[in-house]
Structures are given as structure tokens and as C-alpha cells.
């Protein structure tokens, strides 16, 4: 991160694609050390499932209401944003309610998810992403958010979905350039055509999917969010280190490592391996 005493020039920043609005967004979502310590509260499906399970434990068998989901997101933002550089929110439940309730501090950055949660899929179960209904990059910029986040599942070996996702990512990237707002792109591998996450064919190709996705897509963002290229305990540590080096080489932008739902000890080891590689 640049500071008044550094030698990083405006020309250098522009060469990295950091125009004034993007640079300001990066500063806003980082802490004083230039570290990204973001909290995600935009996961609608998993949050709805958690609230539904909580209600069942209380003997109430029903779907959570809009108000209950909003309340849960406000509680999360209030509790966790105090120790975060930024909070990631969704447009439907989170952004206005979290900000309007004054539970996101004025010194905490705000990122808004642009993609639709639980969008359509093709005949083999591969995602076909699109904008959150009623939302756009322009709207996210206009409400004063600091950055846009785009989650785009991507599988190079499934051409129908891959072509659709590629075009959608390009569109969001161009919109972010037009409106001068920072873009964080998150690509994830996915099972399709009857696979599950523990299916051997998915496990076997995941590392290559992660690396190839970075090679094709990392140019269309300012910060790239990548999955760990492999599985702890499946591939050897030496193979995983090789995969991480290939991922680093493939990514055309600074990248961060997604936790992708693993527990903290596993994620800690993944981060340590990524740093060493």
C-alpha cells in the first residue's frame, strides 16, 4: 500500500490499473497496514439454512422471514465489523439494512456482491451467472460502496457455462472500469453432470481448474480471489507447492486465498503453504 513516504508514483499506479476511484476503494477496504481483513455477510443460501436449522431446534418448522434474515445480517455486521477492514454485503438483504442501522462503522469499507445468488444452471448443472435482480455496477457505485465483488463459478472443461461466465465477467469488469470502482473477482470450481464435491473426477481436476481459471480470468479484475489448488491430504505437499507456484504464475493480478469453507486449521496451513510457495 502506498504511503506519503513511498516512491510509488501515480504513473505506476495507473500502470497497475488503479485509477483514482479504484485506488480509493482499495484504501477503504484495507487496514492501516495495507492488509485486507474483510468479513463476508453476503452468503444468502447458507445463512437461510442456518436460520432454518435454528428454528427447527426451537420446534418451529418453517422458512425464515425476510426480517429474520435481515436481523441476522445486522447482528453479524455489528459483531464482526469492529475488527474488520471491510464488510461484504448483498444488495437484497444486507447493504441498506446494515448501513442504515449504523452497524458498519464509518471507517469500515463496504463491498457489495453483484451476482445473483442461486442463479440458473444449464442441463448438466453448470452455473449461468447474472446480475442480482435490480442491481448493477452503476447502482453499487452510486450508493457509495467502495468495491464490487463478483463470484463466478468457472469450469474450463464445460464450454457452455464457461463461455457464458467468461462474457459475464468481462461485462462486469468493463462496467467497473467505466464507473471507476474496484473489482474483486472470485472464481470457484464446481461439480457438474452428476458429480459431487467428493467425486473422484472433481477432486482430480480441481487443481487444474483453479490454475486455468486464473490464467483465463484474473486479468478481468483488480484483486483476484482464488481457491486452494488441490486438497490437503490428497496430493502431496510437494505437489501442492508446485500447484501454488503455477497459480501465482498464472494470475495476472494480486491474489488472495479463499477459505472455501474449510476449517481454520486447514485454512491456516493452506495460507502458510501459499506464502512459502
What does each model-found stretch correspond to?
Residues 39, 186, 224:
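Conserved, mostly hydrophobic/aromatic
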Residues 102-117, 165-185, 206, 238-257:
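Alpha-helix-loop-beta-strand connector modules within alpha/beta enzyme cores
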Residues 1-141, 146, 151-157, 220, ...:
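Alpha/beta catalytic barrel-like cores
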Residues 154-158, 165-220:
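Conserved anion-binding
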Residues 223-277:
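Catalytic-face loop-and-helix region of soluble metabolic enzyme cores
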Residues 71, 75, 135-138, 164-178, ...:
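Alpha-helical scaffolding segments of alpha/beta enzyme cores, especially the outer helices
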Residues 60, 64, 68, 127-128, ...:
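Alpha-helix N-cap and loop-to-helix initiation/capping positions
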Residues 87-91, 149-153, 158-161, 204-239, ...:
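Catalytic beta/alpha-barrel core
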Amino acid at each position: 500500500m502506498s504511503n506519503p513516504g513511498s516512491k510509488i508514483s501515480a504513473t505506476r499506479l495507473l500502470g497497475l490499473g488503479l485509477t483514482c476511484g479504484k485506488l480509493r476503494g482499495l484504501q477503504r477496504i484495507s487496514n492501516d497496514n495495507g492488509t485486507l481483513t474483510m468479513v463476508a455477510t453476503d452468503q444468502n443460501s447458507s445463512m437461510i439454512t442456518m436460520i432454518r436449522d435454528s428454528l427447527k431446534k426451537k420446534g418451529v418448522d418453517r422458512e425464515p422471514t425476510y426480517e429474520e434474515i435481515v436481523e441476522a445480517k445486522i447482528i453479524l455486521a455489528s459483531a464482526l465489523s469492529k475488527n474488520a477492514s471491510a464488510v461484504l454485503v448483498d444488495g437484497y438483504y444486507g447493504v441498506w439494512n446494515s448501513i442504515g442501522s449504523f452497524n458498519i462503522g464509518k471507517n469500515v469499507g463496504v463491498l457489495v456482491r453483484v451476482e445473483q445468488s442461486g442463479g440458473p444452471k444449464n442441463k448438466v448443472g453448470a452455473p449461468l451467472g447474472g446480475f442480482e435482480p435490480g442491481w448493477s455496477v452503476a447502482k453499487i457505485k452510486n450508493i457509495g460502496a467502495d468495491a464490487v465483488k463478483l463470484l463466478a463459478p468457472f469450469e474450463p472443461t464445460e464450454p457452455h457455462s464457461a463461455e457464458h461466465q467468461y462474457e459475464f465477467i468481462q461485462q462486469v469488469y468493463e462496467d467497473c472500469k467505466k464507473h471507476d470502482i474496484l473489482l474483486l473477482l472470485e472464481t470457484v470450481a464446481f461439480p457438474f453432470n452428476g458429480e459431487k464435491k467428493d467425486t473422484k473426477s472433481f477432486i482430480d481436476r480441481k487443481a487444474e481448474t483453479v490454475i486455468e481459471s486464473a490464467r483465463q480470468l484474473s486479468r478481468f479484475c483488480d484483486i483476484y480471489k482464488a481457491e486452494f489448488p488441490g486438497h490437503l491430504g490428497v496430493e502431496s505437499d510437494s505437489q501442492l507447492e508446485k500447484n501454488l507456484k503455477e497459480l501465482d504464475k498464472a494470475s495476472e493480478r494480486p491474489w488472495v486465498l479463499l477459505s472455501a469453507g474449510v476449517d481454520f486449521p486447514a485454512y491456516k496451513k493452506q495460507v502458510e503453504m501459499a506464502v512459502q510457495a
